[in-house]
Design a protein with these regions (language model features):
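Short beta-strand segments
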Residues: 84, 170-174, 222-224, 257-259, ...
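Short acidic, glycine/serine/threonine-rich loops at helix termini
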Residues: 94, 117-118, 137-142, 159-163, ...
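Flexible loop residues that form catalytic
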Residues: 130, 153, 226, 261, ...
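Charged (often Lys/Glu-rich) extended helix/loop segments that serve as interaction or gating elements
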Residues: 281, 287, 292-440
Length: 440
């Protein structure tokens, strides 16, 4: 999403927050010198709701959803924008996406349950997953889920056995495209746990098997080549490879789901493509090699919510090791943001109390957990961090809450949506008693 253009260039230049691509649109340093998001002072929010806390700009999320829809509407009426809900699987997020006219992608029975609870019409739900259980498939079929994305021969047989009516399906294929991103979020290469390979004829066999089915109605193909992608050319190549496959098996898909994957800015220096450019490449690519009536589906997740959210922490300890490092320890860590440990992900950080001051202390923001690797941000400049400060890491809106865990018996943080200066809790903070709730 483009940054808020309403601010003058001089104001933006003087405000490091407004100038940064990693914060929600409209974020700034307020008159008290503090970080402000969606009109909310982050220090005041931390005092009110406690820390750690996931904090989102609701308008930022809505703005990005509308930008996707607008970008398609300017080019075609044969499209569907599908929220990849694994990025932020909270009922409030599902509800917001439904209100903005998006469909939803769910990858488990739990995500399906939340989508239905948020009011999504079953016909607008797309069920994914490389190992869907019989219970999940039964739930989906009983609910009337619109589209099932088939991922294996075992699943084809399982679905065929459970169904007593027609079910619209897409076959997930792996086009053999390897974009420049982390190995753990590459999904389109031949060696992948997802989908049917095009190069090894598995996809061709899958098409034939589904065509023989009495209940599975093949309406299209799905291909997702990976996540956090800054290059657009791999999408073009993937579409061309899929088109060649369709010609080879005489398939004229009603739907072509070209996945998600658009990267976001995690660092001030990151320059991901704009949503409009991303949509242009996909629409032009599909129109060049497929029938004009083919409906184009995309599945954004990270690019909808990633830069819309930040995480706020409270500093508990500042430990200087002379000649080595200064550790700023906060009251969260790998239980609320696993990505630095899982992917080696890098983040910015700011002292929200002094967001407008020039950072002068080289520090490492460490978590509270019993792991030496529990480091959120390594070797970053902070403005004189002291005990009691609120430290914020931006661009945590995707896969922070989704991957949160109870390591060391730490309750998971709340999710707070902010709009026009008001913050509201949409997921409450867990308590110590919650940790006992499932014990027998």
């Amino acid at each position: 999403m483009s940054r808020d253009r309403t601010q003058s260039s001089s104001a933006t230049a003087a405000d490091p927050i407004a100038a940064s691509p990693v914060y929600p649109a409209g974020s700034r340093v307020n008159e008290r010198g503090r970080l402000e998001i969606a009109g909310c002072d982050l220090v005041e929010l931390a005092d009110r709701f406690g820390t750690p806390a996931y904090i989102y700009s609701e308008d930022d999320i809505r703005g990005r959803a509308r930008e996707y829809v607008r970008a398609f509407e300017e080019r075609t009426d044969a499209f569907e924008v599908i929220y990849a809900s694994k990025a932020l699987p909270a009922t409030a997020a599902y509800r917001l996406m439904r209100e903005e006219g998006l469909s939803v992608d769910v990858a488990s029975g739990g995500e399906l349950h939340m989508a239905l609870a948020a009011g999504f019409a079953p016909a607008r739900i797309h069920l994914h997953g490389n190992n869907k259980t019989e219970a999940e498939l039964r739930y989906a079929f009983e609910a009337g889920v619109g589209h099932l994305i088939l991922d294996s021969f075992d699943e084809i047989e399982r679905a065929e056995r459970l169904l007593d009516r027609p079910q619209r399906v897409l076959i997930r294929v792996t086009p053999g495209i390897k974009p420049s991103t982390h190995d753990y979020v590459q999904t389109g290469q031949l060696d992948s746990k997802f989908g049917f390979g095009l190069a090894d004829e598995l996809a061709e066999r899958a098409v034939q098997r589904v065509r023989e089915s009495s209940h599975l109605e093949l309406v299209g193909l799905h291909a997702h080549i990976g996540s956090q992608i800054f290059e657009l050319e791999p999408y073009v190549k993937a579409i061309e490879v899929i088109a060649d496959f369709c010609d080879a098996v005489d398939l004229r898909p009603e739907l072509l789901n070209v996945g998600g994957g658009l990267g976001i800015a995690y660092l001030d220096t990151d320059q991901p493509p704009e949503i409009d450019d991303y949509v242009e490449v996909k629409v032009a690519g599909v129109r060049r090699v497929f029938d004009p009536a083919t409906r184009i589906l995309v599945e954004p997740g990270r690019s909808l919510v990633g830069n819309a959210g930040v995480t706020a922490y409270r500093v508990g300890t500042v430990k200087e090791i002379p000649g080595v490092r200064t550790y700023v320890a906060v009251d969260g860590g790998m239980s609320d943001n696993l990505r630095p440990m899982l992917y080696g992900a890098h983040y910015e950080a700011v002292v929200a109390d002094r967001a407008g001051e020039a950072p002068d202390t080289l520090a490492t923001v460490a978590g509270m957990h019993c792991e030496s690797g529990d480091v959120l941000v390594r070797d970053t400049l902070l403005a004189a961090p002291t005990v009691g400060d609120v430290v914020v890491t931006p661009a945590t809106g995707a896969y922070g809450y989704a991957m949160a865990n109870n390591y060391n018996g730490v309750p998971r943080p709340p999710v707070i949506f902010c709009r026009e200066g008001e913050g509201r809790v949409v997921v409450r903070r867990e308590t110590w008693d919650d940790l006992l709730a499932r014990d027998e």
